[in-house]
């Protein structure tokens, strides 16, 4: 299980969230998932870190059926809902039915099949047999309401979306 703690401490895998507003959003999503029928595997909640102030939260994993719509919001934390499916088509339909599309992962022994499936996900980044791997030189953005076009400033192409060119020439000030 992921270890919550102070981010500079060795062994910490999950640091504090940025502020109380984000903590409230995450805890609210955890409660809503249970209200919608999600069964806790790891129940989440707040975490106490001895001697440290901060907004620490435990990881949360829930089991649900696809019809429960247990992903009420995009939660940026160690939060997952596991929905068993009967086949690949159902998995793709479930993944592509949300308004979110930041990233997806396909885990398989058959790399060719994994790449074919990755092409069918509606997201900005899809990875096969890895997750959250970002390479410089490739854009990192989402689809739908996740991230938005050009959201990931990770290469020259996306960096220029946020800049305006300007040249300033300076000569030595002439002596009087």
Task: Describe the function of each predicted region.
Residues 1-99:
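NAD(P)-dependent aldehyde/semialdehyde dehydrogenase
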Residues 56-176:
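Conserved C-terminal structural/oligomerization subdomain of aldehyde/semialdehyde dehydrogenase
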């Amino acid at each position: 299980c992921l270890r919550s703690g102070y981010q500079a401490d060795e062994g910490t895998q999950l640091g504090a969230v940025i502020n109380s507003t984000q903590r409230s959003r995450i805890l609210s999503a955890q409660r809503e998932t249970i209200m919608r029928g999600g069964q806790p595997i790891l129940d989440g909640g707040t975490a106490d870190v001895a001697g440290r102030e901060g907004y620490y939260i435990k990881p949360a994993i829930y089991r649900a059926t696809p019809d429960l719509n247990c992903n009420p919001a995009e939660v940026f934390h160690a939060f997952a809902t596991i929905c068993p499916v009967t086949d690949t088509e159902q998995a793709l339909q479930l993944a592509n039915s949300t308004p979110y599309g930041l990233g997806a992962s396909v885990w398989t022994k058959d790399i060719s099949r994994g790449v074919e499936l990755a092409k069918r996900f509606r997201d900005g980044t899809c990875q096969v047999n890895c997750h959250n791997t970002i390479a410089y030189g490739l854009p990192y953005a989402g689809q739908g309401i996740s991230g938005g076009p050009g959201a990931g400033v990770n290469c020259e192409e996306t960096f220029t979306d946020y800049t305006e060119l300007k040249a300033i020439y300076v000569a030595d000030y002439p002596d009087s």
